[in-house]
């Protein structure tokens, strides 16, 4: 009997063990930069202390500012809290997931835990065809307005929880962040649900669907494509099938961006078909959701650069926005015709993050606009305000990959 045949059983055991460990503790290679660029320092000459002070000010106002005009974070009882969409008088999985991400990036464990407990207590579906999903829209008392899911909420929940698992040590009675994240990763791939409910990720297209229902799973939202997140899930998912799936999703989403971007303006639509074609009507325009695609492309480039396309694309869309002059409307047809007479700090914020991939000369005006903009207040402070703070973190070098200890 050959030595190879004698060693085969032992090798198989070693491979199985190493495969199981990959999901819990991926090797450090390929995990992106150990620190992210601070564009405010690079391009605006701001000191690190100035950048931190601006971020601290945004945190303080949005989490502990005036109840009526400033804050978004509202504590409930002894151990819960929610992020409020003030203008629509509701709580959304989008906002809760952004609040969690801001908290983990700023090392705010108490606020993170309060938010997550509210999510699990009020948004989570623990049975039925939606098991493992979260209601995207609730009243302030936690009752559901719409029990359905918006796919980006689950995506950002999973990523924030994984970062929390790697940043904070487990203590007796604490939230098991890693288990919560894995449950969401599993749920998003589960298409065996029955009735009208589907997987959040289309099993064949390997794209996040607009919503996991029979109708809304026939198309996607380009801003739900987060290849930088999928790259990390491909390392940290505890299942081999999951790791393979997320690796494929990262490749698909990068290719999808190339199909969905207008060749001249770089703009992408609010909703689109799986082949990148925009939906008909106003949802085929560059609108509120689509602002976020600018940052999605740039963050992926910052963490996992693959080719030169992300720079070309970021240059294209920032150049188009700058061509509008001093007043930059916040919505357009994909070929560049304005369909709005409003400006929004949320668009400037996402364009500033585009500087992680774009030519510095194109990025600098948007970084300056973001730096000079006041923290959003008033009725419509929710969406603009959260994008404002996320952009400060991403452009300011504070939006980090928090990896398992053994991968650092």
Give names to the regions the model predicted.
Residues 106-107, 165-169, 234, 238, ...:
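Short coil/turn linking the two alpha-helices of tandem helical-hairpin repeats
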Residues 29-71, 89-93, 128-132, 146-152, ...:
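Extended ligand-binding clefts on enzyme/binding-domain cores
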Residues 9-20:
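Bacterial N-terminal signal peptides
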Residues 1-11:
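Bacterial N-terminal signal peptides that target proteins for export
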Residues 38-154, 160, 170, 290, ...:
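N-terminal carbohydrate-binding/catalytic regions of secreted carbohydrate-active enzymes
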Residues 297-300, 322, 335-342, 350-408:
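A cross-kingdom marker for long, charged
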Residues 116, 161, 178, 185, ...:
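Inward-facing hydrophobic residues that define packing positions of alpha-helical scaffold repeats
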């Amino acid at each position: 009997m050959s030595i190879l045949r004698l060693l085969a059983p032992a090798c198989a055991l070693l491979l199985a063990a190493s495969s199981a460990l990959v999901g819990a503790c991926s090797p450090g290679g390929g995990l992106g930069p150990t620190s992210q660029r601070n564009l405010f320092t690079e391009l605006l000459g701001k000191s690190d202390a100035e950048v931190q002070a601006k971020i601290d000010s945004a945190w303080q106002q949005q989490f502990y500012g005036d109840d009526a005009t400033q804050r978004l974070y509202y504590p409930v009882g002894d151990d819960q809290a929610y992020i409020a969409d003030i203008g629509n008088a509701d709580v959304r999985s989008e906002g809760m997931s952004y609040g969690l991400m801001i908290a983990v990036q700023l090392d705010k464990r108490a606020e993170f835990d309060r938010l997550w407990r509210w999510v699990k207590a009020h948004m989570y579906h623990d049975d039925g065809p939606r098991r493992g999903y979260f209601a995207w829209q609730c009243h302030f008392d936690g009752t559901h307005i719409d029990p359905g899911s918006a796919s980006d909420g689950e995506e950002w929940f999973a990523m924030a929880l994984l970062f929390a698992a790697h940043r904070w040590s487990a203590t007796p009675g604490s939230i098991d962040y890693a288990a919560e994240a894995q449950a969401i990763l599993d749920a998003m791939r589960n298409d065996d649900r029955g009735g009208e409910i589907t997987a959040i990720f289309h099993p064949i297209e390997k794209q996040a669907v607009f919503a996991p229902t029979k109708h809304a799973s026939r198309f996607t939202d380009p801003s739900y494509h987060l290849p930088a997140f999928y790259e990390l899930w491909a390392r940290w998912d505890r299942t081999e099938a999951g790791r393979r799936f997320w690796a494929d999703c990262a490749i698909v989403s990068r290719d999808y961006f190339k199909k969905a971007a207008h060749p001249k303006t770089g703009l992408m639509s609010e909703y689109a078909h799986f082949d990148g074609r925009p939906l008909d009507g106003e949802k085929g325009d560059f609108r509120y959701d689509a602002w976020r695609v600018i940052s999605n492309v740039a963050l992926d480039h910052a963490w996992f650069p693959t080719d030169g396309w992300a720079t070309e694309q970021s240059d294209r869309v920032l150049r188009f926005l700058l061509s509008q002059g001093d007043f930059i409307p916040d919505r357009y047809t994909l070929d560049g015709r304005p369909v709005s007479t409003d400006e929004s700090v949320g668009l400037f914020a996402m364009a500033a993050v585009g500087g992680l991939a774009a030519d510095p000369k194109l990025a600098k005006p948007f970084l300056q606009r973001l730096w000079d903009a006041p923290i959003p207040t008033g009725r419509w402070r929710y969406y603009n305000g959260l994008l404002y703070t996320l952009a400060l973190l991403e452009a300011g070098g504070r939006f980090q990959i928090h990896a398992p200890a053994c991968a650092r």
